[in-house]
Amino acid sequence: MKFGGTSVGSPERIKSVARLVTRNGRPTFVVLSAMSGTTNELVEVADYLYKKNTNSANEVINALEQKYMGHVNALFDTEEYRTRMRQFLCEEFAFLRTFTKDFFTSFEEKQIVAQGEIISTTMMVNHLQETGVKAILLPALDFMRTDKNGEPAPGAIRERLTRLMEKNPGYEVYLTQGFICRNAYGEVDNLLRGGSDYTASLIGVALQAEEIQIWTDIDGMHNNDPRFVAHTEAVRQLHFEEASELAYFGAKILHPTCVQPAKYAGIPVRLKNTMDPDAEGTLINNELVRGKLKAVAAKDHIVAIKVKSSRKLGSPDFLRKVFETFEGYQTAIDMIATSEVGVSMTIDNVSHLAEIVEELKKYGTVTVDENMCIVCVVGDLDSANTGFENLATEALRHIPVRMISYGGSNFNISFLIREEDKQAALESLSATIFGKKKNEQA
């Protein structure tokens, strides 16, 4: 069971999660994020320290310490546990203050950011123990490992975690942190933000769990973005590939990396709502409902790049040179469309956009369109199921479409549009595919 920051965002929420993790009466492994807002505040501390602004860094640390001291009084009933937690927090925040006196690098930043999850898991395990639950904290730094490329190392994780579990049998609840780890050199490191979903999936696979549960503040994956479209509905079941597409193209409830380990191990993933724990949520497994469109998602901040080949370089290796340019800057391509004279691509990582464009100019005329958005329709879109692509394109007939990607996946058809047209596109797709008209959404 994995719980995100909003799920443990207050002492009351921590108590609710504690009840959830013990209600099935079976041994449970729990992955926790930092309490909501904490990681952002720790990143703020690191930013100040990079700028050598120790006074501002200390102000944030002091405010954070006061907030957590208040949480202790609300979360714990006995003086024994309150004293224990106050002592722990004093040591934690004293540790954070040591970074205001030393040379500061990305290594120190990772240690600072890691403390949010260390605090939340320590508070949770002590709360469980105070209420009589046999619980233990297994620090992620003892078993979560990444390789030299910064990717999780499943074999090393499984070996270390199995050894830890064998040394600590018989507990009702095992807890760990979500995105902190050690790299290939044994140094404290962090997975990308949102990586706690990935951690939960890797742990579930390592332990051969019956099910991996991701708990958030929404009732499963919805068939459209509820921030833009009213009266969306939770999708009760998704195939692993459908869930991957939705997560990659903008469904914030699930991190894209979470799905693949579970898919290969054949372990179902269930998305649940901590605010409404009895709601059905979304089940992700290997079952595919034939001939059905499941959901719509959108990905913002997309840049489209078009390269029109010059006659001189209009050779068979034109595409190879274009793709090698993106590979050289470790920039992934989301969508691609080719013609006899050129190629169009989209990216969302613009950290090397200027360099990429400059290099692409060697191979042809380059056009860049920013402030674009990818809208995707997900479901059983196998080529044998005719008509669904027409349904999607008909819904967007009044919206300028820059690119269409179809056929690279049996589960997704994607449209590149302007960001300003996003809401209209999502509403129209809901009306056409799911029968939710705009006047019903008001």
Regions found by a protein language model. Give the residues of each.
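Flexible loop/turn segments at secondary-structure boundaries
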Residues: 8, 38-39, 145, 182-184, ...
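A conserved regulatory-domain signal marking ACT and ACT-like small-molecule sensing domains
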Residues: 280-442
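Structural motif
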Residues: 27-30, 111, 134-136, 172-175, ...
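Nucleotide/pyrophosphate-binding catalytic subdomain
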Residues: 1-254, 259, 418, 441-442
